[in-house]
Amino acid sequence: MKYRVRKLFSSLLLVSVLVLTILLGSDILNTATAAAAVRQLEEAPGQVVYQSRGTLKDQQGNRWGAIAFKRIRPDGKASFDLRLVGFPGMVEIDRTQPLLLTNSLGKTWKANDASTNIFTDEIQPHVGQYDLQPLVTQLQTAIPLTLTLATVNGEPVKLSIPPSLVQEWQTVANY
């Protein structure tokens, strides 16, 4: 009896380790790729910003800040942008190229650069901002996305966006 219990326990432990290894290897349990939270800020009287802030990893394992936000101005005009922030000195974004959003089915959208809206003094080469207003409603919340960010050195940065973050962006866009 003692031998059977030990053998059963060993088998269960082995199966558990194998399942955990498979899940970790396939990135299913990787919650660090996108942890986000929705925030509401009043920037000025009558001007409100809704934000989704997340942390993403590129294909090299470098962390990026992703801030999707809707700004509603006092006159009622609204915009919805995505700001991507890399580590200073690691990347120089090519602002002459659009941000490409590609879903796992191969559908691609282009988001135009809107970085001139964020820099008052000096352009930061590791920060880019893109206009998602025209396309955010077209993104499917059940399908993961890959963002492709052009760089000056020609090697694009690829960021994986889980469906939950796409859904959060759409929630923010609908405020």
What kind of region is each of these model predictions?
Residues 62-100:
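Short, surface-exposed binding/anchoring microloops in extracellular/periplasmic proteins
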Residues 159-175:
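Short beta-strand elements
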Residues 51, 77-79, 94-96, 142-144, ...:
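Extracytoplasmic
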Residues 19-31:
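C-terminal segment of classical bacterial N-terminal signal peptides
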Residues 37-74:
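Low-complexity, acidic Ser/Thr/Pro/Gly-rich terminal tails and inter-domain linkers that flank the onset
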Residues 2-18:
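Bacterial N-terminal signal peptides that target proteins for export
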Residues 105-154:
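Short, solvent-exposed, Trp/other aromatic-anchored flexible loops in extracytoplasmic proteins
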